[in-house]
C-alpha cells in the first residue's frame, strides 16, 4: 500500500524512464523534416559519416537521435513502414542495455532495427539472437534491404553451416542466429588449433528476441560438446525389463509395499528398502550382480545409475508428452515451446533408457569435452539487451542474475481484450467437453477465429479427436506438425478458423485477424496484380467480419507453471488495439492443481459435490492457482540462483583455461612459456624427494635421479654434485637441475629448428590442455553430484564445492605442465613430414567434432541433461576420479599402495 502511495506521488520507476525517453523521442521527431528532405544517396551517406564521427570520439548516445531518425526514414523508403514513437522508446531501451517488454503485434522486429543500426556503427558487430533458425532467417531477410540501403552488411549463422560461410557471417555488421548456435560457436572457437579457425570476433552487443524464453526458461540449459563414451547398450536392454515389475509408493514417508517413490516436483525417483531388495534379486538372476553383493557397493554404482535411469524412463517420461518417436529415434519435445529438438539427447543414461523402453536401437553415451550455460555465456557480452511480450513477472530475476532492467513499453493503441475468469472442472474429461461446447457456441454466434492452447501434445490430440467427433474442421500445431507451423499460424486469424497449438511461446508469427493474404499470394504460381487485388479485397472483408465477431478467441486448456507462458498465449489476441477474448479451462487433474494448488482447495471443491459437466468460478480458487504459479516461479528462480553459484566456479576456471588457450594460439613461439613449465615441474618433482626445509638425511637422492631418468630421460649425477659441494642446499639444487634440464631442452630445440619446435610445443601444450580439461569437467560434474551430501556433516556445500574445485583445478594445472615437460623431453625429434602429419591429425580431430545440443531440465544440482548423438567419431574413454586426501603423504584412494603425492596426486 505504501509503495503504491509513493508511486502515485512520484510516479513508478517505469513511468520515470518513459518520461526521460520521450524527451529523446522529441529530438528524433524534430529531425524528421530535415532527414526526409535528403536524397537516397545522401541518406545512405549518413552511415559512413556517423562511423567517422564515432571514430573521432563522439559517443553512440550522442549519435542516437540522428541515427534513429535516419533509420526511420530509410525504413519508410525501403520497407514502407515508419517507426512509431513507442518503437523509438523500445529502440532506446535496447540501446541502453535493458529489456523492452512490448505486447505481441506491436512491431518488435522493426523496433530492433534501430538499436542494431546504432550499435553497428562502432564496427564491433551486433548479434541478434532468436529462438529458432526459421525466425533468424526470416528476420534477417526481412531487414536485409533496410540495412543494405544504409550500407551495413548482414549475416546469418545456422547449424551445419560451411566454415567459410559462418566466418563471413560473423564478420558482418549485424549477425542473426539462434542462442544455441552462438553458444556452441563460442565453445567450438575454444577448441580450435589456430586463431584463423575461430569464427566469433568478440562478444560486443547482443539483442535477444524472446529474451524471457532464452534467459529464464533455458537458463539451466548447458551447452555441451561431447564425445562418445564406452558402449553399454546391453545393460540398458537387460535392465529395461526391471521397471515393469516394480510399482511406485504413493507417499514418501508411508511404506505401502511400493518399490520406489516419485518426486514429481524434482522429477526424481528414490528406491525404498523393498525396492533395493527386489532390484538386487533381479540383477542377481540376470548375472549382473554376484550373490551376496550389495547394489550400492562402490563397484556396482554403475548399475544404480542404469536402474535409476530405467525407472525414470518408464514412470516420469511419457511418449507424446516429453518426447515423440520419429524415424526410429526418440526426439525430445521442449516443455516450454512444444517444439521438437532433433539432435538433442538427455544425458546421465536417460535417453538410452527411453530408447530401451521403446525398443529402439540404443545409441552410445557421451562424455563432456566442453560446456557452458546460457547464464554464463550471455554474461560475457559487453552489452546485453532483449525484447519480449512478457518479462515483467520475471523482472527481479533479470536484474539479479543479468543486471538487466525491464522497461514496459506502452502500446500504440489501447488494449481492449476481454480476459475472462478461469473455469474449474472436476476432471479433464469434463473440462475438454466444456471446451468443445464453448467452441460450438462461438461458431453459432459468428465467424470469430479460435485459438486453443494446450500444454502437451497428448492434450492437443485429445481435443483434436473430440473436435473431429463434433464435425468441426480445425488445424493442429504441435511438435509433429513442425514443418507446417508458419502456415498454420499465418491463417489462424481467418474467419471460423479453429487452431489447436501446443505451448504458443516462441512461435514468433503474428496472428492477423482475417488471415494473412500475403501468405496466400506467395503460394500462387506467377501471381498477377488481379490476384493480389482479389486476395486483398477478400481479406478486408474477412478482417471486418472477424472484428464484428469480437476478434480472436483464446481458450487455454490448462494453466502452465509460469504466469508468463499463460500471458504469452493470451497475448496472441488483442494485438494493435484489436478486440479479443481469453479464458482458461482447468480441472482438478491438471498437473499444476494436483501438485501445487494445495489439498485444501481440492478438498473443498470435491466436497461441493460438483458433477463432471459443472464448473466453478471463484476468486479464492483463482487466487490459489496464482499463488501456486508464484510458488513454482520462486522455486525455479531459487534453483537457477543456486545452480549459478556452482556454475560460477566452473565459469571462472573456464575463462582462465580459454584465456590461456588464446594466448597459446596467439604466440609465435612458446619457448619462454615451456621453459617456465620446466622450472615449475622440476621444483614440484624435487619436492617429492627432497621435502622443503628438511635435513640431508631425509633426502631421497637416488629416487630423484631415477625419476629424472624415467620421466624425462635425463641422467644427472645429483649425488655427485652434493658430494662435490656440501653447501648445495635445496634451493640451489632446484636451480641447478632446472638449468641442466632446460639446457638440454634448448639443445633439442636447436636441432629441430625454431619453426618445427614452435609447432611441436603448440601441439603438446594444446593436446595436454584439452585432454585434461575434458577430464577435469568430468571430475567437476562428479563433485557437483555428490556435494550436497556435505550438508549432512554440517558443512556448507557451496563452500566445500569451491574448495574442492580449486584443489582439482590446481591439480589439473600441475598435471598439464608435467605432461608437457615429459612429452617434450622424451619425444624423438620429428621430421618435417612427421610434423605436418601431426598438424593434419589435429585438424582432422577438430573437423570430426560434432556439436551436441544439451537441454537440461535440472531441478536441483542433479537432473536430466541432454546431449546429442552427433559427437566425436572416435570414442572417448571415461576418466576415473578420486577424492583428494587431507595429507599428500596419505595412501592414494585409487588403491595402488603408493602415497597420494606419488600417484594420482603427482604434480
Swiss-Prot record:
SUPFAM superfamilies the UniProt entry points to: Helical scaffold and wing domains of SecA, P-loop containing nucleoside triphosphate hydrolases, Pre-protein crosslinking domain of SecA
Reactions catalysed: ATP + H2O + cellular proteinSide 1 = ADP + phosphate + cellular proteinSide 2
Cofactor: Zn(2+)
Top EC class of this enzyme: translocase
Chief localization: membrane
GO cellular component, one term: plasma membrane
Keywords: ATP-binding, Cell inner membrane, Cell membrane, Cytoplasm, Membrane, Metal-binding, Nucleotide-binding, Protein transport, Translocase, Translocation, Transport, Zinc
Coiled coil: none
Keyword Cytoplasm: yes
Its EC number(s): 7.4.2.8
Residues holding ATP: 87, 105-109, 510
Positions with a binding annotation for Zn(2+): 892, 894, 903-904
Function: Part of the Sec protein translocase complex. Interacts with the SecYEG preprotein conducting channel. Has a central role in coupling the hydrolysis of ATP to the transfer of proteins into and across the cell membrane, serving both as a receptor for the preprotein-SecB complex and as an ATP-driven molecular motor driving the stepwise translocation of polypeptide chains across the membrane.
Subunit and interaction comment: Monomer and homodimer. Part of the essential Sec protein translocation apparatus which comprises SecA, SecYEG and auxiliary proteins SecDF-YajC and YidC.
Record-stated family: Belongs to the SecA family.
Protein name per Swiss-Prot or TrEMBL: Protein translocase subunit SecA
Organism: Acinetobacter baumannii (strain ATCC 17978 / DSM 105126 / CIP 53.77 / LMG 1025 / NCDC KC755 / 5377)
Name of the gene encoding the protein in the UniProt record: secA
